[in-house]
């Protein structure tokens, strides 16, 4: 008998033991990564390494798991370390309060991991991590853009080469291609186009983090700050955790190979006819 027996009932004894011996790194423990990390430790993953340089800001309160009024100004990885250990004291959790970049990739990836979760929102750091994982043959799953979106039903999981309608994914694809990486990166993304920003609110936006600016990714220095909601980053993080656990267990993951949204009745009929082998009627 143990606190996580409900998970063992679902995945079986062998699956549970596999998860207990798994080593996973989560890079970026903000809105996406905090939920991914907690879901992984609750699922029974025995070792987690958490990497993030940042501290909790007031503007994190709307979407990040560790963010409360009491935790503003505290280290994100420190808070998640404490939270994960309080959930499963037997888990080996390591916190690295550092900014992931190409110069420290070898050091941070050196311990060896069964899976890496990319929940970084800085393009330079994100590309550095994905290239490092690709070059090492390291399994990784990456989150594309959750900001500016509202519809949780449109999150998909595919190879990055199949992403569309996602400005972040487009930039990442181009940067990866410039470094010789065309595909082989699994990612969670949405085909919902980013919603527009309220110009009145945008004009009034200012960084209100009480601990001030940081040297890597300050909101006050961004050209555009996307609007966010509570559920979309969480859904992305939980999706990443689900992909990792299913992959570790050797189980298939439902992806965007499924039939896309059918759209209008005419398009729906055309797609149904195509699947049945019927000739489409003239428009």
Residue positions per predicted region:
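Adenine nucleotide-associated cytosolic modules
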Residues: 1-283
């Amino acid at each position: 008998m143990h606190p996580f027996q409900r998970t063992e009932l679902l995945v079986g004894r062998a699956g549970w033991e596999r998860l207990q011996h798994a080593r996973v790194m989560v890079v970026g423990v903000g809105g996406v990564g905090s939920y991914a990390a907690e879901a992984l430790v609750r699922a029974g993953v025995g070792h987690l390494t958490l990497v993030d340089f940042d501290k909790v800001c007031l503007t994190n309160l709307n979407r990040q798991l560790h963010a409360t009024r009491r935790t503003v100004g505290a280290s994100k990885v420190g808070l998640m370390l404490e939270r994960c250990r309080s959930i499963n004291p037997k888990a080996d959790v390591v916190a690295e309060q550092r900014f992931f970049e190409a110069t420290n990739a070898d050091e941070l990836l050196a311990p060896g991991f069964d899976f890496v979760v990319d929940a970084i929102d800085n393009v330079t750091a994100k590309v550095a991590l994905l290239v490092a994982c690709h070059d090492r043959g390291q399994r990784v799953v990456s989150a594309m853009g959750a900001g500016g979106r509202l519809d949780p039903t449109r999150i998909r999981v595919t190879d990055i080469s199949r992403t569309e309608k996602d400005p972040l994914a487009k930039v990442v694809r181009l940067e990866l291609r410039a470094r010789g990486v065309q595909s082989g990166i699994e990612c969670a993304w949405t085909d919902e186009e980013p919603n527009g920003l309220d110009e009145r609110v945008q004009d009034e936006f200012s960084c209100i983090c009480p601990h001030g600016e940081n040297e890597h990714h300050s909101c006050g220095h961004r050209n555009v700050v996307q609007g966010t909601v509570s559920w979309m980053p969480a859904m992305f993080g939980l999706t990443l955790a689900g992909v990792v656990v299913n992959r570790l267990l050797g189980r298939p993951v439902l992806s965007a190979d499924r039939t896309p949204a059918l759209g209008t009745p005419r398009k729906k009929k055309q797609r149904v006819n195509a699947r049945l082998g019927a000739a489409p009627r003239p428009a």
